[in-house]
């Protein structure tokens, strides 16, 4: 115990009363340091995607240069970024006979190359789900995408895409739900539908009819019957009011005679 205490005191004494000083750089060393190109990240842009592997753009500038993308001294570089490898489920609807492309990597494949990833596809037939036990292996002709051309009703279901990098680390899992409809069942032409609804006379086209609801003879009979009926009702009301007024007057006279 005493030996360790003595050793600690000697170390403190050496550090406090040491005559060592910070060495200064010579002029030649300063010139050599100025020739070294040191780049720092002056600005970083958000990742291109919120899930899965994306691309991130950074601005690199040498030390002492102001932050300005247009400055010739600065340069931009693109690197990969990953916030979350789970992308969840997305659904889309298409009609039979059309061409449908399910892309798993999109811009990342073009930027980093085809052989930087291992892509596998699985398929759950005729159901929209994220239950992995319902998926079976799906052979895609193109590794990074599934091309359905022409689209058939048997192609409806959920497609799952798994992406691994060269280190066998999962960087993306995506679910694509595909609903296939017959062109006779539903028209998905949004532009044509919007034009149709912007025309005022086309909004209630189904409510108009080219033929009359009632014939002219029917209308004439209705008028012939309604006029006498209305007159009779008016006469009855007039007689009722006349009798009521006479009865009221008679009652008033009787009251005066009794007084």
Swiss-Prot record:
It is found in: Cell membrane. Residues 243-259 are cytoplasmic. Disruption phenotype: Mutants develop normally into adult males and females. Male mutants are sterile, whereas females show normal fertility. Expressed in sperm. The keyword Lipid metabolism does not apply. PANTHER family: TRANSMEMBRANE PROTEIN 81 (PTHR35670:SF1). This is Transmembrane protein 81. The lineage of its organism: Eukaryota, Metazoa, Chordata, Craniata, Vertebrata.
């Amino acid at each position: 115990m005493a030996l360790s205490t003595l050793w600690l005191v000697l170390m403190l004494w050496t550090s406090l009363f040491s005559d060592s000083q910070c060495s200064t750089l010579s002029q030649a060393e300063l010139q050599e340091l100025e020739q070294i190109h040191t780049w720092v990240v002056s600005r970083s842009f958000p990742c291109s995607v919120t899930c899965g592997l994306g691309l991130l753009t950074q601005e690199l500038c040498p030390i002492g240069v102001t932050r300005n993308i247009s400055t010739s001294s600065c340069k931009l570089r693109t690197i990969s970024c990953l916030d979350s490898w789970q992308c969840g489920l997305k659904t889309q609807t298409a009609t039979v006979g059309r061409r449908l492309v399910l892309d798993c990597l999109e811009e990342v494949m073009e930027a980093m190359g085809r052989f930087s990833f291992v892509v596998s596809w699985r398929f759950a037939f005729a159901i929209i789900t994220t239950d992995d036990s319902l998926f079976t292996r799906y052979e895609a002709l193109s590794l990074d995408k599934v091309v359905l051309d022409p689209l058939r009703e048997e192609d409806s279901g959920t497609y799952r895409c798994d992406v691994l990098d060269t280190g066998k680390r999962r960087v993306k899992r995506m679910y694509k739900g595909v609903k296939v409809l017959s062109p006779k069942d539903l028209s998905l032409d949004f532009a044509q539908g919007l034009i149709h609804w912007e025309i005022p006379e086309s909004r209630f086209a189904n409510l108009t009819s080219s033929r009359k609801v009632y014939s002219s003879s029917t209308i004439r009979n209705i008028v012939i019957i309604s006029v006498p009926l209305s007159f009779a009702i008016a006469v009855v009301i007039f007689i009722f009011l006349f009798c009521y007024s006479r009865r009221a007057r008679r009652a008033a006279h009787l009251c005066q005679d009794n007084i």
